[in-house]
Amino acid sequence: MSVPTLSNKPENVDLLVLPHGEEKVKCQISDKGDCNIFTIKLEDHTIGNLIKQSLCQDPKVTFAAYRQPHPLQNAIEITIRPKGYAGVKLLSDNVHSILNQVSTLRETFANRVQKYKEKNAYHGNR
């Protein structure tokens, strides 16, 4: 018995590779003019939630949210209402902050693993 496939499911390559000439990030201004709406292609809830949480903690941001417009499209929209600051700069600063936090976490984890291995090497453990 075969498993039915989804006829509207995108090809795997479309979920991983940005087509030539397409932009990774696009910025629009909301109809009211008070929000920046960023569309980020080839990303999902993982990065969307991280960015939204970081923006919500930023005192220069009045409102931040994200959504995935359609479950079969590999893109997210991040909406930012800044307090008199450029939305592009706020997004960039917060993404760099997240990258620094992840880098610090990676280094700390690697150091702890190394210390654990050194400590347990004398006991004949892995």
From Swiss-Prot:
Going by the UniProt record, its keywords in alphabetical order are:
DNA-directed RNA polymerase, Nucleus, Transcription
Q: Name one GO biological process term.
A: transcription by RNA polymerase II
Record keywords: Magnesium included? no
Q: What would be one Gene Ontology cellular-component term for the protein?
A: RNA polymerase II, core complex
Q: Name one Pfam family in it.
A: RNA_pol_L_2
| Entries under Gene3D superfamilies matching the protein | RNA polymerase, RBP11-like subunit
Subcellular localization, as worded in the UniProt entry? Nucleus
Q: Which GO terms describe its molecular function?
A: DNA binding; DNA-directed RNA polymerase activity; protein dimerization activity
Family per similarity comment: Belongs to the archaeal Rpo11/eukaryotic RPB11/RPC19 RNA polymerase subunit family.
Q: How the protein assembles, per its UniProt entry?
A: Component of the RNA polymerase II (Pol II) complex consisting of 12 subunits.
What's this chain's function?
Answer: DNA-dependent RNA polymerase catalyzes the transcription of DNA into RNA using the four ribonucleoside triphosphates as substrates. Component of RNA polymerase II which synthesizes mRNA precursors and many functional non-coding RNAs. Pol II is the central component of the basal RNA polymerase II transcription machinery. It is composed of mobile elements that move relative to each other. RPB11 is part of the core element with the central large cleft.
- Protein's UniProt name: Probable DNA-directed RNA polymerase II subunit RPB11
